[in-house]
Amino acid sequence: MRRRRTLTRQTEGSALVEFAIALPLLVVFLVGIYDFSGAFNQKQKIGHAAQEAAVIAGAQPMTDMDPAAPATANPYSLQPVLEVVFSSLSADNVLPQGTWASCAVAHNHLSELKWSFTITGCTPDSLVIAIDRGWVTSVGGPPTTVGTQVTVSYPYHWRFNSVIQLLVPGAIYAATTNISETATVHNQM
């Protein structure tokens, strides 16, 4: 009994024990701050690319777009939009420094004036760009305006998953989150 009281009153080594407990928490907080700021930064860059693409798409002519065209139709006027997104994300270091020429672009004609493009081969993940040239908005009735809506989606790979294992071994945390941003503009042509 006396020995137990003596052990609980001793303070030698308590700083080392506190440090051993606090260090994993500190590492998790630091990596969490770094990782969440990286995700937010990537979201801003994707939003910027979507806005640039919407401006370019809204200024493109619609003469090569036929709502009655077959599902295999791929309007040439949308190609600059894809290149703008790729160039913007490459310049912002969201995409690896690949070249547009090495990309494989699969398109899907969703409806009359809506297309979805999946870019693979030049990035480790799939970059998805959805373009709606017939986006209609009405605020409380007529008059309505017709614009272009561009949605850009690209995954973010979290680093937090490997660090959370320090505190909770076996914890499952999503390793990838798909970040998507949408931008709209009024059609100029």
Pin down the residues of each PLM region.
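Low-complexity, S/T/G/P-rich flexible repeat/linker segments used as non-globular hinges
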Residues: D64, S153-M189
